[in-house]
From Swiss-Prot:
GO molecular function: translation elongation factor activity
InterPro entries, alphabetized: Elong-fact-P_C, NA-bd_OB-fold, Rib_uL2_dom2, Transl_elong_fac_P/YeiP, Transl_elong_KOW-like, Transl_elong_p-like_YeiP, Transl_elong_P/YeiP_cen, Transl_elong_P/YeiP_CS
Pfam families, alphabetized: EFP, EFP_N, Elong-fact-P_C
Protein name, as recorded: Elongation factor P-like protein
Length: 188
């Protein structure tokens, strides 16, 4: 069984008789000799969707929950619900906008490589690919000869995400964005 220090963002764990999805992990290192490192986890109850914040000691044993990943594509929006379609058996998976708000910044109609995490038959989270291609809708005009310098400018994507891009990038171009660091990687 893994220790608290081995748990990663996006894991499903069992705690106090409930299954939680780990959304965020913060490492807390208290000052002083006797202070043990703590891992503060922001989790969501799979059954109810309620938020819970728990702290675990580094060597505390945590039980991983059984979960599966299914490949899916974004299908459509129905009010406040976002529907994703299973790539193999076309099962629809519905998510509330608030539950996947951060992930929506990287999802466009043609985003490939999306994974749905399923615990006990219930879709609990979306796992994004490491990089996605998005189109720029708003940025300052490109500067000729700017490829020689490493200066950047803000650019807004079709999804609303804003990242820093090199000065030579123009509106309408597709760029590759790193989903974990929220950074420009290259032209698509």
């Amino acid at each position: 069984m893994p220790k608290a220090s081995d748990i990663k963002k996006g894991s499903a764990i069992e705690h106090n008789g409930k299954v939680y999805f780990v959304k965020e992990i913060t490492k807390l290192t208290p000052s002083g000799r006797a202070g043990a490192t703590l891992f503060r986890m922001r989790m969501y109850d799979v059954a109810t969707g309620s938020k819970a914040d728990e702290s675990f000691k580094t060597d505390e044993i945590i039980t991983l929950a059984d979960f599966s990943r299914r490949s899916a594509t974004f299908s459509y929006v129905d009010g406040n619900e976002y529907v994703f379609m299973d790539s193999e058996d076309y099962t629809p998976y519905t998510f509330n906008k608030e539950a996947i708000e951060e992930e929506l910044l990287f999802i466009s109609e043609d985003t490939q490589g999306i994974q749905i995490l399923i615990v006990d038959g219930v879709p609990v989270a979306i796992e994004l690919p490491s990089a996605v291609d998005l189109e720029i809708v708003d940025t300052a005009p490109s500067i000729k000869g700017a490829s020689a310098s490493a200066r950047t400018k803000p650019a807004t994507m079709t999804t609303g995400l804003t990242v820093q891009v090199p000065e030579y990038i123009a509106n309408g171009e597709k760029v590759k964005i790193n989903t974990t660091e929220h950074k420009f990687m290259s032209r698509a």
